[in-house]
């Protein structure tokens, strides 16, 4: 991700490319895997504040690398090269390993990709419109969003049934009040 991909004023992140690194350490920029992967993501105030802090604290190398015309990367390694997905996986692994050496209850393997699954599941549990979630995830097929990335279980099903039951009770309560002539309800509200 580069500085040009982030618009803090409009609170939008542009996603239309990805940085890759080959086994022989050559860097290149390519398009997203699918056309659906090209998107503009709205961000909330909390995320915008995080990006503002990252940009403010960003350590710029003496010579910023330009890769296929892209520069201003947000994160660099200790050699001044922009971070790629593998760097983030190593960082996650190191955090989990450190945690597991300190605490008795072990943390499972967590990767940046696991975070995508968690985000998707949490948004689905919150009731986000599935098509909106598909767009945010950058999936061309909603089946991938709902069947691969969204993980719901018994507790989620029970919570949803309770929510529906509460809606039904509220509807019945409104119907009881509907026995009062509309004119009388209107008069009382004035």
Mark where each language-model region is.
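Short, basic (Lys/Arg/His-rich) helix/loop patches that form interaction surfaces
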Residues: 41, 57-66, 70-82, 86-135, ...
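Short, charged phosphate-coordinating catalytic segments
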Residues: 1-19, 131
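Ser/Thr-centric signal marking residues that sit
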Residues: 32-34, 111, 118, 132, ...
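Generic recognition of well-ordered alpha-helical segments
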Residues: 45, 49, 53-56, 90, ...
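C-terminal secondary-structure termini that scaffold catalytic or DNA-interacting sites
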Residues: 10, 23-38, 45-47, 60, ...
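Catalytic-site neighborhood detector that most strongly recognizes the C-terminal catalytic loop/helix
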Residues: 6, 18-19, 137-163
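Generic beta-structure capping elements
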Residues: 16-18, 46, 78
